[in-house]
């Protein structure tokens, strides 16, 4: 059977549901999928969402369910994770990138510990925009109570530098909406609970901006291998991470040594020459006036002035539990693992650990999430939001995302 062609007629946005356990994230995901089936004709059953398949990202197993749906103006890919640990791992590894999120809070219970934790994570790992759905509103008879919960959530969002006053809030009942559409598709105006789902998606359409596509960003490619071709010069190979590169462009070689500037004299892919390479292409780039010894795996080629080498940074890290193939014992400040960044392992020291409340921690247990400050022995091209793995003798013991560059 031929695969159905992906129609690229509407702009594509990646979103996800976040929030405390049992506040209704998965039910909401199913309700959105079923409600919007009026536009696309397909919906995903709740039992399929809950039994999410395992995926591997940077050596970590994560359960995530992917659901697609469409509104009148957009195509969405929606990620929902069954367990709290899966959320933490997904957000830190960036296994399913989110351009925005729907924060689900039970109106009957108000914000809970994981509500706070997911907002903090969204801030740290760069989920730029959130919309709030106050679920289980059918269980709240008092309008004032709903307003109180809304104020509480607003305050929580403000604490983590989200614009609480601007963020759209929609209240409703995912369960009642789902039950209503199970009897057949509903148009706007047919059912008050289904209408709340339409309202929610209208807020998502309007408030969460379409992301800048990889090809629109500045050029960057991590070097995987280097060859020299007699009479022509040095070729660096790798996959273009973002942007577009044309013959004749000036680029910088960043990381490990002093930054060098050079000119692109040729671009090849599968033994054919190209005028330009773009995000996603595996290419060989011929560069002028650079010796093979001047460039090595782990450096990056980038548009001049867009990325610089650093040694010290803060990161949000998930440490693998022993049942995930991680360490069996805790590690302490001063621990020296390898940080696997893009294409290279660099040794670094963990200078300090910080808990969510800002208190210093001396040690970290397998299975923990922690904020850490790390210092590498060699400077490499690092930027905020960049993902990495922490390895020890070749096995992954943690995953992280850079939240702040220090020096």
From Swiss-Prot:
Residues 80-83 are annotated as: G3. Its EC number is 3.6.5.3. The keyword Metal-binding applies. Mg(2+) binds at residue 26. Residues 59-63 are annotated as: G2. GO terms for molecular function: GTP binding; GTPase activity; translation elongation factor activity. GTP binds at residues 19-26, 80-84, 135-138. HAMAP family: EF_Tu_B (MF_00118_B). This is Elongation factor Tu, chloroplastic. It comes from Emiliania huxleyi (Coccolithophore).
